[in-house]
Structure formats: structure tokens, C-alpha cells
Amino acid sequence: MLIFFHPKFDIEPALNPVDIKEAQAFRYKAFGMVNESGLDKDEYDQKFNHIIIRDRRHRKVVGYFRYTCYSSGSRIQNGYSAAHYDLKALERFDKPVLEVGRVCTDPLANDPDILRLVWAYLAQFVEKRNIVFVFGCTSFEGTDYKKYIDCFAVLRARYLGPKNMLPSVKSQSVLKFAKKFRSEVNLKTAMMKMPPLLRAYLLMGGWVSDHAVIDNKLNTLHVFTGLEVSKIPPAKRRFLLKIP
């Protein structure tokens, strides 16, 4: 088990049904979902490890993510991302890879340390397990792509993955932004509009798919996001390992 100390937050695994249900309720609110159960739950919850970040004083959940480790790229077809993207090109990895999902924070908490703790945990896990590739689906709020045209134009221009690793289309409802958005945009403005999680991936050397999936269940647009651990700038890697 990875151990962290932070003056305001506790980061801990959800190990029992009560904690997992609390996490599912938090995810439901964070993603703005609407259903009768009031929970965001799926069949992958049984396959993933769940991590909760709590406000130490009130024990309130303020952050969450789930993850699972595969011994090689040949095993990723059983994961969440593979249900939305054709990941056959990533079977090339012959060392451990890590899938991360459902990363969310409490917007009312408004504290960047919550997301930093997510990355700190993942950085230590990557080091401990010799992970070579980190991946997942990174979401834009809502399904109206017009709000994010600048973001998609920048992703197309600067952050598409290598051709020999790009996921192919698998979902029926997709936005092929690499073919659609070619306009010049203000990079600084576009990066400010970018979801914080995706921005962090990109700043560490991450890349995205050439299309987004329109996920009506989660009320999001999401892109496949990949990060080759060897491409993370050394200074950034050292910084993450020193948090908190």
C-alpha cells in the first residue's frame, strides 16, 4: 500500500461496499449524471482498484479515481477504454501498463492539491510496478463539442498520438476532430479551456486519439489519452514523486 501525508487530505483505498458506494455517488455528482439510482456504477468497478481522497477534517469525499494494471498490452482488451476504442495497436507493449479512469474532483473544493495527489499516487505506483505506459479516457464536460472547438483544434495540431499507436474508431457515436477542425487558434486560450486532467497529461508528454467519443451515459465527450512513461520530462517526474 502506498502511504501519503497531506495536511488537509487523506488518500485511501475504497476496500468495502460502503466506501465503493460512496465513491459511486461522488462520481454520479461529479459527472452530472441523471438516473434513478443516484450512482455511477458499471461492470468495470469489480475489475478496478478504487482510490478516494477525503477532506481530513470533515471526512468528505473530494476526489476519486480508479485504476488497474495489466502485465502487458495484450491484456488491455478487457478494460474500460477498450470498450470505446480499438486498442489493438497498443498490444505492442510487452511490459506492465496502467489504465486510469473516472478521475474526478469536487468543484466546490477548488483546491489544485486534490488533482496533484492523484498524480502523486500514480507516479509512485508507476515507479513501484515499472509501468511503461499509462492510459485512459479523459473527459470534456457535456456533449456539445462546439464549446471546445479551440481545444480540439490544438489537440489536432500538436497532440495526436503516433500513427503506429493511435486507437481506431470503435464506438458508434464519435467526433472525428482530426478531420474536422483545422483552424488556427490561440494556444494559451485553448489550453486554459482544456480539462485540468487532460492538460496535465499533455504537459507530461501525453497524446490523444484522433477522435472523441460522445458518451451520453456520462454526459461527456472523451478522448483516449496515452502517456509513455519514458517520455515524461525528468524534472516533472521528480516533482510528482516529491508530492505531497
Annotate each language-model stretch with its function.
Residues 15, 55-57, 69-71, 102-104, ...:
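Short, flexible loop/turn elements at secondary-structure junctions
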Residues 219-231:
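C-terminal "cap" of GNAT-fold acetyltransferases
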Residues 62-63, 210:
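A structural microfeature
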